[in-house]
């Protein structure tokens, strides 16, 4: 309700309103659409269900399938744009990249009127980070973006600000 109210207040000032929110019901997404939200982002984090459950041992985020199907519910509710992505580095990056591509392709095929985008964030080393990661190098990220562009030529690709400016500047031409 809070997000819908914020969108209603913002709608007169912006031509498009996007949200990156927790998994909701289709009715809740429809309430957001009715309030003026037209773009939705949901990071699955990883498509490896066993790993996902290990990373989320309790709480509302634990329901893997509910989260996995959130973009579908958002599209059914009327979102004009849906953005999905996995956090590269939680699992083997090629596996999550593959399933992210399949997920985006399925949404695109099921909802041809919805614009699809894929985000490509990578785990980056930082103080306090856990050690059980599967690093994806800059070279791996380039390979992923090229594969996405070949497989889903009309799909938007979002780069993370986690990437070095030098890297972002060079990746723009690929996506």
Regions found by a protein language model. Give the residues of each.
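Conserved C-terminal portion of the radical SAM core fold
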Residues: 38-39, 44, 65-129, 138-163
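Local sequence-structure signature of Cys/Sec-based thiol-disulfide redox active-site neighborhoods
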Residues: 134-135
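Non-catalytic positions within long, well-ordered alpha-helices that form the structural scaffold/packing
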Residues: 33, 75, 105, 172-173
